[in-house]
Amino acid sequence: YSPLPDGSRDGTYFLNTYKPETKSIFEAESVAFHEAIPGHHLDRTIAVELEDVPDFQKYVASTAFVEGWGLYSEQLANEMGLYSNDIQQLGRLGNDAWRACRLVLDTGMHGMGWSRDEAIKFFRANSPIEEINANIETDRYIAWPGQACSYKMGQLKIEELRRKAENELGNMFDI
């Protein structure tokens, strides 16, 4: 995804078009803002342009920061008035519920002994995720403990830092 260091190739946003009839379009804008601008594309483009940062920090970043920024970007796009309609807003809110569920699912399965079926049942009851995706995502969380939590935890930390900047800068703060 990241652009090449020498600028010879731009960053690329790959869209999964496999079985489009199974995809929800109500979250399309939320995903695009997460992946492109103001999300990952903006973040990774700026990272490679930094001059006083070691190369390894330009190209390898923590999941909590990178994905936290992606989630933060979904809300930032809302503040900027970029969502085109209420259906896309609903998609953003549904995605937010899904990311919050990750915290509960990961903790439930890896800390509280929840079964896969218990996790899927919770997921389906508390987010708008479709059954097939709930199964796939739950299997991912089983195989990769803590990774999915890092998204929301990163977002929460970025929001905390933003509040601090808003308080310190007052009227000078501007998104």
Regions found by a protein language model. Give the residues of each.
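Long, His/Glu/Asp-enriched segments that create or flank divalent metal/ion-associated functional microenvironments
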Residues: 1-175
